[in-house]
Amino acid sequence: GLQQHANYFIHLYLDLTPETIDSQYVHLAQFIHPNAHIEFKKQLAEHEKVVKKLHLSSRFDIKHLTTNVAKQTVTLSGRLVFYQGPSPQGAKDKTFVMQFSNKLGKPFILKIAEGNNENK
């Protein structure tokens, strides 16, 4: 359940290009919990502005995934690789925490936040 959803959503959130970001974020927004919509839209708009302005692409390679069912969170650690056009611009080890809330049996995203990166 949660792991598959987190895996799918993190790729919509981070595996993007200036050409795909609009459709990916529209799709992702359908899975945002109504209570988190306003804050999340701001977060997505900021990402979109940077990606389009600098013509950046990114890819997130998951190395480790941990689920906390009680808290409805999934922690994803991995390597975020940046490109400008076809040229690699660097990579960073990153950790993201996704928090979910079930609504009518469907998981909705409450939050995607950068977490502490213990797995370097």
What feature does the model see in each segment?
Residues 1-11:
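Short, low-complexity N-terminal intrinsically disordered segments enriched in polar/charged residues
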Residues 4, 14, 19-120:
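Structured, amphipathic secondary-structure segments that form assembly/contact surfaces
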